Amino acid sequence: MSVTLQRMKTPHERLSEIVGNLEVRGAYAQIGLGTGESARTILQSTPLDKKLVIIDPYGSMGYRMMDDDKLGYPSIKVSRDNNVQIEILAGLYKLALESEKHFLFYPMEDIEFYQRFQTGIFYYDEGEQIRTNEYGFVYFNAENCIGDLIEGIRFMNERTPKDGVWIFNNINDYNTRQQELLDELMEEANMDAQWESDFLVATKTIEPSDCLKPKQEAYAEDNETLTADVSTDPSITYH
């Protein structure tokens, strides 16, 4: 009797499989660029009619990690410097050119993005101005503090349609309490969460009530609710 052993997928193979099989409204987003390898995998697997939004601060800066240092204080990691970042971005733009895929890069911290673009992002495509405030796929790649991750979940919860998928990387860096907190947040956000060997994969089970409304409620740093009034412009296509 012969036994066939099934090879486990690598993280990039699994990521490519999820993105490639996804059929959902909205843009795709990656929070945190890292080495750029995950972005390459996502970009290669993204449909031609989708835009990938990448959010990452450009240049050397310190940011808090999930875990504490040896003395119990929040550990700090310095992001890659300008020269490394430009090399990573150059490789991504080369891939985009060769594959005819497109991505939008926002050089800022994730919290700043959430504050600035509560009512959606604008871009031009074939001469048409487009506004989108939906994210059907989100890859949380930021190795930052749990508080920032919560803000990202709050922001995306209002903007992810039914069957949208979130993937959380670096799950082995979370302690037991952080994993429990993520489970609680996924339940509150109506996400069906599955812990895998490399990722937490969560799928939206219902439509958010106000995902496409011009008046979009969002969370601010002081935990107050902001309402941004956006006038309806007939020349803009809303996605």
Q: Predicted regions: what is each one?
A:
Residues S2-L5, H12-H239:
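S-adenosylmethionine/decaboxylated-SAM
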